[in-house]
């Protein structure tokens, strides 16, 4: 069996660059492993209209970038709000290509529901107001983003994260999703961020229950943006799911 590649999908107000520290760790620990961080439509290098956003368009973007990288079998990794689009990408790729799905501090709506249906804490009123906006949403104020995404980061990590926040579609929290076509045989891992202020552990466990089929839960004592705060630990987790036995160091 050939070694799968790793496809990394960002969440809201982020783009592919947020994965750079983890991609670097993967390359250092496992030379030759193919890993690609994708941009969803309207972010980074991927053209698109943030006001014409759809789950289907995101899934198509993920598949196209995986194909462009020459990846056949893959481990799909999604952070935060990409929990709503990762199953659609897996459905398009099919069980014959998706070795495993990994959800990192993700938000998974109820079947047929929206992310707004799941939100509590500081994000619900923000998302509800944002959904009524006539244009893209500016990145959150840095003081707010630092508190919700970056608590516990070093100064350098926090600067890296905040400098790479991007505008977001107001549709993100109100798009209904369906996982009816997700192949049930694809195994799923959940990376649970214990100090997460954006999606607290209880909210993540509720998302796990809505998703169903999670057979592997790994806890990290870190904040929401684990790919920046704990890239070495996250790389180790991903390599174990790929099948590479590479330890820390």
Name what the model sees in each region.
Residues 77-82, 86:
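Gly/Ala-rich beta-loop-alpha elbow adjacent to hydrolase catalytic centers
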Residues 194-221, 228, 240-242:
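Conserved loop-alpha-helix segment in the C-terminal half of the alpha/beta-hydrolase fold
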Residues 34, 40-75, 89-92, 116-120:
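Active-site loop/oxyanion-hole signature of alpha/beta-hydrolase fold enzymes
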Residues 163-181, 186:
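Active-site nucleophile elbow and catalytic-triad environment of alpha/beta-hydrolase enzymes
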Residues 2-47:
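Conserved HGGG/HGGXW glycine-rich cap/lid loop of the alpha/beta-hydrolase fold
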Residues 91-92, 96-135, 141, 172-173, ...:
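Flexible "cap/lid" loop of the alpha/beta hydrolase fold
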Residues 7-11, 79, 192:
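The conserved beta1-alpha1 loop
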């Amino acid at each position: 069996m050939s070694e799968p590649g790793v496809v990394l999908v960002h969440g809201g107000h982020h783009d592919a660059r947020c994965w750079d520290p983890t991609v670097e760790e993967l390359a250092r620990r496992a030379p030759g492993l193919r890993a690609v961080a994708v941009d969803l439509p309207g972010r980074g290098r991927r053209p698109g209209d943030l006001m014409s956003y759809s789950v289907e368009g995101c899934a198509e973007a993920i598949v196209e970038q995986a194909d462009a990288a020459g990846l056949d079998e893959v481990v799909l990794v999604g952070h935060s709000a990409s929990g709503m689009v990762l199953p659609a990408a897996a459905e398009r790729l099919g069980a014959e290509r998706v070795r495993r799905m990994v959800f990192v501090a993700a938000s998974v709506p109820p079947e047929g529901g929206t992310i707004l249906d799941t939100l509590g804490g500081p994000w619900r009123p923000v998302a509800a107001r944002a959904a009524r906006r006539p244009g893209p949403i500016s990145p959150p104020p840095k003081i707010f983003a630092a508190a919700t995404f970056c608590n516990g980061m070093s100064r350098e990590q926090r600067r890296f994260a905040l400098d790479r926040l991007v505008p977001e579609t107001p549709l993100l929290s109100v798009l209904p999703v369906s996982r009816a076509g997700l192949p049930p045989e694809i195994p799923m891992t959940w990376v649970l961020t214990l100090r997460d202020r954006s999606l607290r552990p209880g909210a993540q466990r509720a998302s796990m229950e809505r998703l169903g089929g999670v057979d592997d839960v790994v806890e990290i004592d870190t904040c929401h943006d684990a790919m920046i705060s704990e890239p070495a630990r996250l790389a180790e987790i991903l390599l174990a799911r790929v099948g590479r036995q590479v330890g820390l160091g």
